[in-house]
Amino acid sequence: MKKTLYDKIYDSHIVYEEKNNTSLLYIDLHLLHEVTSPQAFDSLRDKNRKVRQPKKTFATMDHNVSTTSQDINASGSMAKVQMQELIKNCSEFNISLYDIKNPNQGIVHVISPEKGMTLPGMTIVCGDSHTSTHGAFGALSFGIGTSEVEHVLATQTLKQQRFKNMKIEITGEIQKFVTAKDLILFIIGKLGSSGGAGYIIEFCGNVIEKMSMEERMTICNMAIEIGAKSGLIAPDEVTFSYLKNKMYAPRGVFWKKALNFWKNLKSDKNAFFDKVVNINISDLSPQITWGTNPDQVISIDQKIPDFSSFDNLIKKDLAKSACKYMGLKIGTYLTNITVDKVFIGSCTNGRIEDLRAASKILKDKKIANNVKAIVVPGSGSVKREAENEGLDKIFISAGFEWRLPGCSMCLGMNKDRLNDGERCASTSNRNFEGRQGRGGRTHLVSPIMAAAAAVYGKFVDVRKLYNGENN
């Protein structure tokens, strides 16, 4: 029987199969952070249980951490308690932890791939929605709730239904100044925020094949915003080259054995997909969200759509509500809209390639007087690499604040947030009401679009930046 990549990984991890299309799956890697794990550990203690596989469990601090100080007191009282609990829990249960003083600390979905913890064919879970990021390596990865965190800690397994298969084949030639972030935003807009519900999405096609691993991670990171359980990309030579000599990757004879296994991790020819979507992106433009959901997105050269263009009443009502919250009107070009803050970072766009791309836009420029801008490297390793390349100096010279690693302004859970009514060009992954702070207005864009907005104090078409049209 021909199998998809998803079915191959799912089937190879079945511990016990039930008749209702649900199985108990073995989990290869369990990632933890300070927010969704404390209750799970408390429950283990209440039931006198141990962590079954501490060496297959890894923790870091990212959601609540201060990006201006490594002092645990700088993050606020609640964050301090959560971080102290994580330190205590990891010590008691013998789990590796990158705390805020560790030079490699950072966002969990940045650390795991860059250290070679994430490997093709794995099952990976974390108490965080954007665990789908790891699917870029051909790993079946998804977010779980706190009760499931407890279950995996105790058993190294998880009960999981079998999802349907969707293939999104992306072809064409991606244009200059159009990025992986623009591509995934476009796909979300095309399919809608529930278009992937009930599916695991495999991304493929010549565009994906040409992407770096960091670009692929951006794609899979936001698969959840289509409503999918996760996203997958089959591993290839790009994957293997990225992983070679990483800290936790196999070495020597084990590397050769791993390669032999990984090279077979792809969907069989003529494998059945429940849904197939073909997208040609040769004419794709830089994208920007205008509403309060990632699927409310347009090209930078388009107007906010008329409510009558939506095909059902629910979408019309959501669009009206979004425009009201965002302080926008239909028919408006976002290039006429000023910004208050710019955020470059997150598990979507906080890697070294993202910082390099943004720094090229900012070199020898200054940000607008009306803008406060911060750049937050996704990990200590990313921060050091950027500093070794002199990127920090470019950002600082332009007027950005160069911060410590963390989730930062992606979510209003730490001290980096928007004030009521402030508008932000953000490289993060969600733009819900209040996501970056109560009353804050979030526009999702690529790192280069965010950098350009910082320079001009408003949204601009980055393609025109070097043509003298945004003066």
Swiss-Prot record:
Pathway assigned to this chain's UniProt record: Amino-acid biosynthesis; L-leucine biosynthesis; L-leucine from 3-methyl-2-oxobutanoate: step 2/4
Any one GO molecular-function label of the UniProt entry: metal ion binding
CDD domains reported in the protein's UniProt record: IPMI
GO BP term (any one): L-leucine biosynthetic process
Binding site for [4Fe-4S] cluster: C347, C407, C410
Cofactor: [4Fe-4S] cluster
Family: Belongs to the aconitase/IPM isomerase family. LeuC type 1 subfamily.
Function: Catalyzes the isomerization between 2-isopropylmalate and 3-isopropylmalate, via the formation of 2-isopropylmaleate.
Protein name: 3-isopropylmalate dehydratase large subunit
Organism annotation: Buchnera aphidicola subsp. Acyrthosiphon pisum (strain APS)
Gene of this entry: leuC
